[in-house]
Design a protein with these regions (language model features):
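N-terminal alpha-helical transmembrane segments of multi-pass membrane transport
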Residues: 1-72
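Interfacial loop-to-helix junctions that mark the boundaries of transmembrane helices
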Residues: 15-20, 73-86, 167-172, 226-228, ...
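Structural signature of hydrophobic alpha-helical transmembrane segments
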Residues: 17-26, 79-93, 141-145, 230-236
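Interfacial helix-loop-helix linkers and transmembrane-helix boundary segments
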Residues: 38-47, 66, 79-80, 100-115, ...
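Transmembrane alpha-helix boundary signature
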Residues: 59-77, 100-106, 129-138
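Alpha-helical membrane segments and immediately flanking helix-loop junctions
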Residues: 82-87, 94-100, 115-125, 138-165, ...
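Membrane-embedded hairpin module used as a gating/binding unit in multi-pass transport
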Residues: 176-250
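Conserved small/polar residues in nucleotide/adenosyl-binding loops
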Residues: 268-269
């Protein structure tokens, strides 16, 4: 066996031989996202891990994401992805978000709850557009619609339940949309408001007592879970994190949820 035949065999077994245009397209998308994360600093904590994970997952013959194999033999990225597919990481992220959230302004001014209704507009627009294409089932359209709410963990959770085959693209689309909000939001704000309106200083809200802040997460979970049981996993973890924060007796758990746990989950999702 001469040198050239050995070289030919080596190349035939290398990733170059298995490289397709689809891999190249995904490489290009991942490089664009990396550029946006590093150069433009659009939500780098979200975009950079997503972009590089996308790059690694599309390396041909690398064995990092073999969906055909059993989960413990399917590559390190597939094993990490099981945490996303099982909704473990989205729920843990919600716990971290809850630990970082102060619901005091909402308790003091419940009318501000209506501001959250704006997210429903984006959800219905995305759902309608997906349904209009005729390419997706109603469940898949609903999962795609959640992207319009700009909420990555919720989009992943809903996709796991309604469109398991679309979890990966929906997750990437949702987090990319979240990362682009700093670019999308300013021109819309300037279009819909005047300069004088943007200079309005909000009045100081009433002081919210500790009892109210402790009772709030318990009441919300009880009421919403009885009204709509399917929201219990996400909402329960969100309010558990908030209870860590507001109880005043679990400082270490609150700090861990806000920092270490949140960062670990961001790495894996």
């Amino acid at each position: 066996m001469n040198f050239f035949s050995i070289l030919g065999e080596l190349l035939a077994q290398s990733g170059f031989a298995a490289l397709t245009w689809r891999n190249c397209v995904m490489f290009l998308i991942s490089f664009i996202l990396l550029y946006m994360a590093i150069k433009k600093q659009y939500e780098p904590l979200l975009l950079l891990p997503i972009a590089f994970g996308m790059f690694l997952a599309n390396l041909p013959l690398a064995g990092l994401m073999n969906e055909a194999d059993h989960w413990y033999q399917s590559g390190v990225l597939r094993i990490m992805y099981m945490g996303v597919k099982s909704s473990l990481f989205p729920c843990l992220i919600f716990m971290a978000v809850g630990a970082m959230t102060d619901f005091g302004p909402l308790i003091a001014n419940p009318v501000s709850l209506l501001l959250g209704a704006a997210a429903q507009f984006g959800i219905y627009v995305a759902f309608t557009l997906a349904n209009a294409t005729g390419l997706f089932t109603p469940g898949e359209c609903a999962a795609i619609g959640i992207i319009g709410g700009a909420d990555g963990p919720t989009a992943i959770y809903i996709a796991n339940n309604l469109a398991p085959d679309l979890v990966a693209p929906i997750a990437v689309a949702a987090y990319s949309y979240m990362a682009l909000i700093p670019l999308i939001q300013p021109p819309i704000m300037k279009l819909l408001t005047t300069k004088k309106e943007r200079q309005i200083v909000m009045k100081q809200l009433r002081k919210v007592s500790k009892v109210e802040k402790v009772v709030f997460p318990v009441f919300v979970v009880l009421f919403c879970s009885l009204l709509l049981p399917s929201v219990a996993p996400l909402l329960g973890m969100l309010m558990l994190g908030n209870l860590f924060r507001e109880s005043g007796v679990t400082g270490r758990l609150s700090d861990t949820a806000q920092n270490a746990l949140c960062n670990i989950c961001l790495l894996y999702t």
